[in-house]
Amino acid sequence: MSQIIWGAYAQRNTEDHPPAYAPGYKTSVLRSPKNALISIAETLSEVTAPHFSADKFGPKDNDLILNYAKDGLPIGERVIVHGYVRDQFGRPVKNALVEVWQANASGRYRHPNDQYIGAMDPNFGGCGRMLTDDNGYYVFRTIKPGPYPWRNRINEWRPAHIHFSLIADGWAQRLISQFYFEGDTLIDSCPILKTIPSEQQRRALIALEDKSNFIEADSRCYRFDITLRGRRATYFENDLT
């Protein structure tokens, strides 16, 4: 019983979640809602579908080092990221779709609107996907993204990060966020992270170095666990209610 009380569903806690309007994060000035939000009822198809099948995934979908390589390997530090997706009671969330996208080692995205002077890597696409197994486990291999400047304030840089999306039982439950890497000196000065008032919530978005799973002369490893719902939930950008 104590576990259920501790991990009970929680409405938005303003002490943990950032306000929609946060002037320090300049983009929120235009993007934050000006009117009261309207709740739309979910239909049965939205809360019960889709169900993903492993046979629809390619063998390289979760290998960002190889899934876009053309005439060589991408440049940069090779890393493995892995972890578990669990619900508020610690139970595994199996067959959840995890999607990731990121900048390359130079801090540049493969997107026509990204005009940063960082070099484009012809062998790196920067996106991947995978399903969690019966234990809620996921893993992918990639190149550690580089930091990049952004037009928030004068000379501000985003710390290295990877965006991720998670879909479990239905499209209406799609959750989106981004995680960072332990030891990055830009984390503490990031205006986006600063909008989250809870230190615990900020730290929950940092992937921890996992030296026990380093691959000798190949890759470093980071672990990032995701908790859905409840007071121990991972902070998601699009789930503020």
From Swiss-Prot:
The keyword Iron is annotated on this UniProt entry: yes
Catalysed reactions listed for this entry: 3,4-dihydroxybenzoate + O2 = 3-carboxy-cis,cis-muconate + 2 H(+)
EC assignment: 1.13.11.3
Protein name: Protocatechuate 3,4-dioxygenase beta chain
Pfam families linked to this entry: Dioxygenase_C, PCDO_beta_N
S-S pairs: none
UniProt keyword annotations, A-Z: Aromatic hydrocarbons catabolism, Dioxygenase, Iron, Metal-binding, Oxidoreductase
Stored PANTHER family: DIOXYGENASE, PUTATIVE (AFU_ORTHOLOGUE AFUA_2G02910)-RELATED, INTRADIOL RING-CLEAVAGE DIOXYGENASES DOMAIN-CONTAINING PROTEIN
Pathway: Aromatic compound metabolism; beta-ketoadipate pathway; 3-carboxy-cis,cis-muconate from 3,4-dihydroxybenzoate: step 1/1
CDD domains named among the record's database cross-references: 3_4-PCD_beta (cd03464)
Binding note for cofactor: Binds Fe(3+) ion per subunit.
Gene3D superfamilies: Aromatic compound dioxygenase
Function according to Swiss-Prot or TrEMBL: Plays an essential role in the utilization of numerous aromatic and hydroaromatic compounds via the beta-ketoadipate pathway.
Cofactors required: Fe(3+)
Protein family membership: Belongs to the intradiol ring-cleavage dioxygenase family.
Binding of Fe cation, residues: Y109, Y148, H161, H163
Example GO biological process: 3,4-dihydroxybenzoate catabolic process
